[in-house]
Swiss-Prot record:
Keywords: Acetylation, ATP-binding, Cytoplasm, Cytoskeleton, Hydrolase, Muscle protein, Nucleotide-binding. Transmembrane segments: none annotated. The keyword Lipid metabolism does not apply. The modification N-acetylaspartate is found at residue 3. Actins are highly conserved proteins that are involved in various types of cell motility and are ubiquitously expressed in all eukaryotic cells. Multiple isoforms are involved in various cellular functions such as cytoskeleton structure, cell mobility, chromosome movement and muscle contraction. It comes from Aplysia californica (California sea hare). InterPro entries: Actin, Actin/actin-like_CS, Actin_CS, ATPase_NBD. Belongs to the actin family. Pfam families: Actin. This is Actin, muscle.
């Protein structure tokens, strides 16, 4: 809290979902899709008080007549006009607070381009007139939320996956690795392998159904080959799912074949290292003296790490890559879907953090580049 007990606003903008709320709370008040929709045909929505754009859940529910855009691709903001709309919606419709009365903590992807941080800073001060703001790296916030300041974070959301080694609260940029394989790709892959079973999901509405199947029924196998054999020889792994129209579908080995692609991207036709190898490669780019601390503090974060079995599998895979005497610990906090936001809530409510905010006055004196001096 600031001197006069005004709660800071914490906004975590993800590729798939935006999480927003008040510093000091233990969970975000608002979680909505990061999408902006515009009517495909002017005048189609007669008498609806024709709006020229819709954001979040409203865009989702009217998607039949809208063209949907995601302003954040692979974790990085690519469309600033739409991003501004999402922030406006966050402050005025979701949180219902005037941003000019609250400090705002925003999150950014690791390796976010410098120009992007400046643009975020500029929009907060010039468009929304925030009294103060700060930009924090997502993975660092997840680590804080787990009660650590040193460790490596595997952060996997809807649009991108990063491995971020952090030492004493600072991300080590030379060792950060990015993998363009995340939740959206897994949903696409699941719809593809369900097609092989004869179930077709093509429209955006049906994509949402596949995402729900993924979230409710998929899991990571400890031993993929063995699990495939079990699935082939018995029906013990089969589960049924009721579609909105009442039809019931059965899903078997798809349950673990879908998230297996995190460990074997070749299943998606991608020639890249899996999340376990990427984590290992990231650790190997760090100074030899801190590797031990990273192996022992490997923290999972983001919605795509929510699959049951993922921590055990990571433990197994990293153990086989690392030196045999190394102590390896994978930390998978139950609230990891929102741990970036939670870390932001913790950070922004610390009394020691209050001097870290970029104030409107500092911005007016130095311009957008102030963000590089104050936020690192």
């Amino acid at each position: 809290m600031c001197d006069d007990e005004v709660a800071a606003l914490v906004v975590d903008n993800g590729s798939g979902m935006c999480k927003a709320g008040f510093a000091g709370d233990d969970a975000p008040r608002a979680v909505f899709p990061s999408i902006v929709g515009r009517p495909r045909h002017q005048g189609v929505m007669v008498g609806m008080g024709q709006k020229d754009s819709y954001v979040g859940d409203e865009a989702q529910s009217k998607r039949g007549i809208l063209t949907l855009k995601y302003p954040i691709e692979h974790g990085i903001v690519t469309n600033w006009d739409d991003m501004e709309k999402i922030w406006h919606h966050t402050f005025y419709n979701e949180l219902r607070v005037p941003p000019e009365e609250h400090p705002v903590l925003l999150t950014e992807a690791p390796l976010n381009p410098k120009a992007n941080r400046e643009k975020m800073t500029q929009i907060m001060f010039e468009t929304f007139n925030a009294p103060a703001m700060y930009v924090a790296i997502q993975a660092v916030l997840s680590l804080y939320a787990s009660g650590r300041t040193t460790g490596i974070v595997l952060d996997s959301g809807d649009g991108v996956t990063h491995t971020v080694p952090i030492y004493e609260g600072y991300a080590l940029p030379h060792a950060i690795l990015r993998l363009d394989l995340a939740g959206r790709d897994l949903t696409d892959y699941l719809s593809k392998i369900l097609t092989e079973r004869g179930y077709s999901f093509t429209t955006t509405a049906e994509r949402e159904i596949v995402r729900d199947i993924k979230e409710k029924l998929c899991y990571v196998a400890l031993d993929f080959e063995q699990e495939m054999a079990t699935a082939a020889s018995s029906s013990s792994l089969e589960k049924s799912y009721e579609l909105p129209d009442g039809q019931v579908i059965t899903i078997g080995n798809e349950r673990f074949r879908c998230p297996e692609s995190l460990f074997q991207p070749i299943l998606l036709g991608m020639e890249s290292a899996g999340i376990h190898e990427t984590t290992y490669n990231s650790i190997m780019k760090c100074d030899v003296d801190i590797r031990k601390d990273l192996y022992a503090n490997t923290v999972l974060s983001g919605g795509t790490t929510m699959f049951p079995g993922i921590a055990d599998r990571m433990q197994k895979e990293i153990t086989s890559l690392a030196p045999s005497t190394m102590k390896i610990k994978i930390i998978a906090p139950p609230e990891r879907k929102y741990s970036v936001w939670i870390g932001g809530s913790i950070l922004a409510s610390l009394s020691t953090f209050q001097q870290m905010w970029i104030s409107k006055q500092e911005y007016d004196e130095s311009g957008p580049s102030i963000v590089h001096r104050k936020c690192f």
